[in-house]
Amino acid sequence: MVRKPARMYRNLAKKAYCRREYMGGVPGLKVVQFDMGNLSEDFPVAIHLEALEACQIRHTAMEAARINMNRRLMKTVGRNNFHLKIRAYPHHVLREHKQATGAGADRVSEGMRLAFGKAVGTAARVAPRQRVFTVWTTPQYVDQAKDALLHSGYKLPTPVRVIVEN
């Protein structure tokens, strides 16, 4: 089956569905790491990526943003000059009621009978002005870190802004 478009899951329409003990099975998390870079050093500058609207960010989008950001930071700043942290965790389980399509689908399909849906992935529920990613670095690399955060924000389903703190 084809993955549904992200706009179906973007809005916070229903309450959080995260009690996994009642679910048959939930697909694994795509986000591999939540902390990257130099974890031992204390950096003076913090740069945050803040979501401007309430939304749900799918774990696949978070992983795409993480890969993009980490790659840009590794190339421009270097492994030892930053600490990247993902601050939102995808707890919410997304469900999908599979529909048969194509020739003869009406004979195979059950319609809306048992339409609760099966778990297809997870998402992080983000509030307005919540910080999703944070990069700590030195003052000389602030522009490169801002650029990396901004470009990874294009992968997320909400408008974002970059905030610099000393």
From Swiss-Prot:
It comes from the Archaea. The keyword Methyltransferase does not apply. Gene3D superfamilies: Ribosomal protein L10e/L16. One of its GO terms (cellular component) is ribosome. GO terms for biological process: translation. Keywords: Ribonucleoprotein, Ribosomal protein. Belongs to the universal ribosomal protein uL16 family. This is Large ribosomal subunit protein uL16. The gene is rpl10e.
